[in-house]
Design a protein with these regions (language model features):
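Polar/charged side chains located within well-ordered beta-strands of beta-rich proteins
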Residues: 64, 99-106, 119-122, 130-134, ...
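Beta-strand/loop substructures that line and gate deep hydrophobic ligand-binding cavities in soluble
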Residues: 133-203
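Charged, low-complexity, intrinsically disordered terminal regions
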Residues: 75, 103-105, 109-123, 170, ...
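Amphipathic, hydrophobic N-terminal targeting peptides for secretion and organelle import
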Residues: 1-2, 220
Length: 220
């Protein structure tokens, strides 16, 4: 596993975006994406709704933030039930929300197995970007040290929203802190995308529509 650059910096001082870009530029690491989904186009093509729905950029961003806090709800297929815990939530005057998170997630190359994932999370509300920085260990709100599983490299994920208010585009990319690029990891990501219904459409969007908007979806 590559050296962890994130564990020592205090939460308020740590620059999530800078760390993500540093890792994205490192030739040793394994990148996937960026991936792009036109939300309304996909909904219209693959689903019938119980009431009229124009999914907005505001909704998409709300979905991203809720998923950040509750991955066990919005990406339930990847999270061990009961394993999520968050702490340290802070909000700055310029619309930046920061917290830390631990959960047990399916491993990328052994999805039948779960491993502990420890993450620094920052949501930039003004530009609608949320960054997840995997780290080897953090001290939680109880003063205990929580440590990530070492069976796979640390990874970072960035999600953001683009497009017009009534034509939102969801985008994301990942970076795995490997010793050298691993071509198997992009294949694993491709397999995950293809497992969604429809393929490539993130499961957290239909979950949000049915759970938070109270609109039922029926596949076409």
């Amino acid at each position: 596993m590559s050296k962890d650059h994130t564990a020592a910096a205090p939460m308020a001082e740590f620059d999530h975006e800078r760390e993500f870009e540093r890792a994205w530029a490192d030739p040793r690491y394994t990148r996937t994406g960026p991936f792009t989904v036109n939300v309304n186009e996909t909904l219209q093509q693959f689903f019938r709704t119980s009431k009229p729905l124009t999914f907005t950029r505001t909704m998409m961003w709300d979905n991203e933030v809720r998923k950040g806090w509750r991955p066990d709800i919005y990406i339930a297929s990847a999270i061990l039930p009961g394993s999520v815990r968050n702490w340290g939530g802070t909000h700055s005057a310029d619309g930046v929300e920061t917290f830390e998170r631990v959960s047990k997630q399916r491993q990328w190359l052994k999805p039948q197995e779960y491993g502990c994932v420890v993450e620094r999370v920052r949501a930039y509300h003004q530009k609608q970007t949320i960054v997840f920085i995997g780290t080897s260990e953090l001290r939680d709100d109880r003063g205990a040290v929580v440590r990530a599983d070492t069976k796979q490299p640390l990874f970072y994920i960035e999600h953001w929203v683009e497009g017009e208010e009534n034509e939102p585009v969801a985008r994301w990319r990942t970076i795995h802190l490997t010793e050298r690029p691993n071509p198997v990891l992009p294949e694993a990501m491709k397999g995950m995308l293809n497992s969604w219904k429809p393929p490539g459409f993130p499961e957290f969007i239909p979950i949000y529509i049915e759970r938070d908007l109270n609109i039922k979806l029926q596949p076409r």
